[in-house]
């Protein structure tokens, strides 16, 4: 039943507003921004400038924020070649407030009622079925899942989710031996605008314990943290000593005593020490140092009031206790670093989703906009003596440029956020918006980053298979598992939830939540609200979790984490950007799923939200922090095998293994039956597979590759079905044979049947965009001499519809003319063709032509081409058995079975053994079994469920295949049944018509065509275009270029010899080249001892070895050394033959041939 419960989460849940689960969190994130958060950010009323002790102020007020959706649908935007944007308008009022005896008088300075259609254009996210959050009445297009933005010129953009730089746990760092830092950030809650950020650092040097200071650049004083905690919390140093020492190991207690004693020495060194005076003196010194324009009282209030912005409305006493709890973690982390979440752990990070990107940019650009207005007022007052604002400043908020840069892939000057949507794989629509990555520049700058390994905190929440296998993104980008999502919350919901949780905590007896000396601090989003009696922590957490599941707080995604291990804290998280996923609940040693017997009978008629309402204690939404500090059993089967006492140790139980994969990995089959690298390679190849046509391919003038005759896979997983990847298809079923064919299909080479290609097998259509900009005078010029390049153009200068373009054909007329200053020439007007040519190697048909007339003529042409498989094209199975077409064979050349059926594809049989892809054989067996019995016992067509990762034994699948064949043909003998189950057939030689000696594995499989096409990559050519200046080959395929073989390359062949040049190229680089001395007696590589080359084996036997110098590659030497270390002797031997100069010369007969 655990598997069925997991499936319920994947399917749509209309009662909860979930229509497409994979991207639902992105839709909610963006919807929250454009419907709510944008109004909160833009609605502003604050002072710009103040004069005369705040009696005169220049105020700005922004109001009447309206967001209007576009009148047209995304398809119309594609046809017009325009972006799909919402329009945001607002009203700006700037006025002067003067405080008088009668009251406040207001004088208007300037105002602007923004009705400009280009004031703020917000790219609109297209959701499932072409819907958008502003206009939910748009019609539904079932195979369009959305998740994209349409940029200008109808370019679709998708984005990944970046990990926030700010961590929710302080960052511990060892600066040098016995010197440590503890850095943390404090960010104001979402209801406080503009958002305030403060970054603090606690430093500790064991040799200078008095300098245990907390500091922040220009925003806080540098002060001993123990004394600061005493100042804020108003407690004694002995209180702080007891609080820091409680439940700590002896080594930490020793350090705590030393720190408190050092703080006492500071107080004793000052006569009549007073903590208030001490802090005030430090504030005054900082005031003088910064040369602040504020008064000392204003400066002190600004510094201390804004200390810890996330606890802005919290009493100073709680801030002091919060600092004590931070110091506890710091001191414990010095001795037990491995038990503390490091900075690479996902426990410490929140994730930026689509809505958060736009929210951050809107906030930053609004501050820039207000800053520009303030500066303009100051400049006008300085120059002209009037308070005025230029209209240009009011009408340029700057948000359009920021949003445009975001969709160009730059978020706050960092690359990696958004990219162009690739139109060859439908699967990329899901995989890219569900990927999570680190800032690339963050990794380059920070030397201590180690995210390139699979971090333990990513377990269960991220797919371990779908990660980049090579390149700069290795370890930096991860794919969410199918059950994972990212939380979103509105500001109003945040405040209500915080209020309800605080009321619940304060419902406890006052003394039980005031254990500030030895209790467990309770924090809500890192803000300290109480300190709980240690004897009540288990009951508190258990009751809180039960109330959360029952909907007591109105939010089922609240995270509550009980941090033990001497750090002693209860952390409650309610903010956005947290990773959450469902788990099965274990309560008091019982799996709650088993306690509800009626659940299984009602499960088919329930949605996931129904289960959460009617059976609240079965499933709990758990964030990654709560999961990390909880005891989780990896499977229901393992849990049920435990004793009762062991079961009581667990809090949660996980779903089956298939739910730990991402959606791309779910498109594979049985990856746990294969070797590990096959899963990573399989995910990369599945994303390169060409999928079916999108709904409006002819309306988009954009590049794309699409499968013409797609088929729905027979062997699928539930995630593949619910995500609609299966329904939208990404391959075809072909009949394969695993055998050798005349030695042609070696390595990755495959044989493909010619008639299979002619019938449209794995046929694709390529859509390509050609765009040119032509000066208007060039476009209107007429050609004087007839050019073959213009043979496909009409009289209007544009290419004809349905014309077939070949290499060298012009797309539009572009004739440049020039007048010669020659009085003797009859015709001093010359013209020449400068048009851009069609450069592809294959012919294409013109599908659509668009023209825009401005100062230039912008021509956009869409060409279509059907492309059948040719030599060199790449294909793959869903188990990463990649193959390249080595030979296209006629049907008469291929072996056939007793029914005359020939294989569509022949694959090298040794690839199964070398790559260990057992699940490929299982897929063939299950697909063949489906063909024998495609309907279930109710007469309904049913695909075969073979999840990507599963705990089902292979014998179970064999038994399923056996039942299918027995049902369709019960009279089969045991041998015939075994052959059908294992897809073994006798094939006949097409030349002799005699059967082969052994049976061949022969059956159907789902085959994918990859986007790596030969004709798109071929660049080498003997003849072609040359540059005018140096008459060498052009660079780049688009310009008809090739690989240049110039003078330096020629000189290498002449001076060095062709054979040596090839050897040098194959050695890869100069660093790979290595001289090695080899002993001619034993064949060992000589060792270098004190600069002398010696054979260790012969020297021990007192032999005099003869060492010969050879040149080889470094990798060869490493291979020999490693083989020798494993006990395998590899001897380097020399060919024994006499030198050529010792051989007697051959006799030469000089007699004429006719005399012989």
Curated annotation (Swiss-Prot):
Compartment(s): Virion
GO cellular component terms, semicolon-separated: DNA-directed RNA polymerase complex; virion component
GO terms (BP aspect): DNA-templated transcription
Keyword Metal-binding included in the entry's annotation: yes
Matching Gene3D superfamilies: 2.40.50.150, 3.90.1100.10, DNA-directed RNA polymerase, subunit 2, domain 6 (2.40.270.10), RNA polymerase alpha subunit dimerisation domain (3.90.1800.10)
Catalysis performed (reactions): RNA(n) + a ribonucleoside 5'-triphosphate = RNA(n+1) + diphosphate
Pfam family, one: RNA_pol_Rpb2_5
Domain of life per record: Viruses
Keywords for the protein's UniProt record, in alphabetical order: DNA-directed RNA polymerase, Metal-binding, Nucleotidyltransferase, Transcription, Transferase, Virion
InterPro entries: DNA-dir_RNA_pol_su2, DNA-dir_RNAP_su2_dom, DNA-dir_RNAP_su2_hyb_sf, RNA_pol_132_poxvirus, RNA_pol_bsu_CS, RNA_pol_Rpb2_3, RNA_pol_Rpb2_5, RNA_pol_Rpb2_7
GO MF term (any one): ribonucleoside binding
EC numbers on record: 2.7.7.6
Family: Belongs to the RNA polymerase beta chain family.
Function field: Part of the DNA-dependent RNA polymerase which catalyzes the transcription of viral DNA into RNA using the four ribonucleoside triphosphates as substrates. Responsible for the transcription of early, intermediate and late genes. DNA-dependent RNA polymerase associates with the early transcription factor (ETF), itself composed of D6 and A7, thereby allowing the early genes transcription. Late transcription, and probably also intermediate transcription, require newly synthesized RNA polymerase.
Subunit structure: The DNA-dependent RNA polymerase used for intermediate and late genes expression consists of eight subunits 147 kDa, 133 kDa, 35 kDa, 30 kDa, 22 kDa, 19 kDa, 18 kDa and 7 kDa totalling more than 500 kDa in mass. The same holoenzyme, with the addition of the transcription-specificity factor RAP94, is used for early gene expression.
Protein name per its UniProtKB record: DNA-directed RNA polymerase 133 kDa polypeptide
